[in-house]
């Protein structure tokens, strides 16, 4: 979607409201909006629109275990809730998105599996941001 985002006038100067400016989702959303030419501002007073990240959580859970009760498969999930306001009105009511990816786990390959988990989480974040950007382009 690089450079292909059509944004409404209400979002030409956008403030991203979040409690966690270090989350993977916030950083990826910010980077993709900047790439698309959206001017991001540091205060709500300067903004023509606001994207509010109301909830931002990621973790993993066990999907299956072996006969010895050792995890053999995990699921990485990422959940965000966001809303979009612009021009004094709500453009997008709060929406919750959850994406998951699963992977097999081998205790003998711990380092490789940790890297795989990071890559899956990054892919999930990119997909979540793509969904939000697509929603913005339909406004």
Segments (PLM) and residue ranges:
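A structural "domain/chain start" motif
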Residues: 1-38
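A generic secondary-structure signal marking the coil-to-beta-strand transition
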Residues: 12, 49-50
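Short alpha-helical linear motifs
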Residues: 30-35, 70, 118-122
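Sec/Tat-exported extracytoplasmic proteins
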Residues: 33-40, 84-88, 107, 131-139
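Short acidic low-complexity segments
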Residues: 38-49
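Surface-exposed short loop/turn segments
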Residues: 46, 52-96, 102-118
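C-terminal/domain-edge helix-coil "capping" segments
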Residues: 108-139
């Amino acid at each position: 979607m690089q450079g292909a985002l059509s944004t409404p006038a209400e979002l030409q100067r956008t403030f991203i409201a979040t409690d966690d400016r270090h989350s993977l989702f916030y950083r990826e959303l910010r980077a993709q909006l900047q790439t698309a030419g959206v001017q991001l501002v540091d205060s709500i007073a300067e903004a023509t629109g606001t994207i509010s990240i109301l909830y931002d959580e990621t973790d993993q859970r066990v999907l299956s275990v072996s006969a010895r009760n050792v995890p053999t498969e995990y699921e990485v999930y990422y959940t965000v809730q966001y809303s979009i306001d612009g021009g004094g009105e709500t453009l997008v009511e709060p929406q919750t998105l959850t994406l998951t990816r699963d992977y097999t786990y081998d205790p003998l390959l711990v380092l490789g599996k940790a890297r795989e988990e990071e890559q899956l989480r990054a892919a999930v974040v990119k997909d979540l941001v793509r969904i939000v950007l697509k929603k913005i382009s339909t406004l």
